[in-house]
Amino acid sequence: MADESKFDQFKGNVKETVGNVTDNKELEKEGQQDKVIGKAKEVVENAKNKITDAIDKLKK
């Protein structure tokens, strides 16, 4: 999942940059949305990992 979130962020950066260079506001907005989605996935994955680690420590 980490790779997926990083890819979404990268894809968003590319779309946003291309949209900015070509003055395509719709593509630029799509890129911004992709970046937010990628960052949200990353935050959820990090939280999931921390919770899993905490549960594992409690089991020991």
UniProtKB/Swiss-Prot annotation:
It comes from the Bacteria. It holds the Pfam family CsbD. Belongs to the UPF0337 (CsbD) family. This is UPF0337 protein SAUSA300_1582.
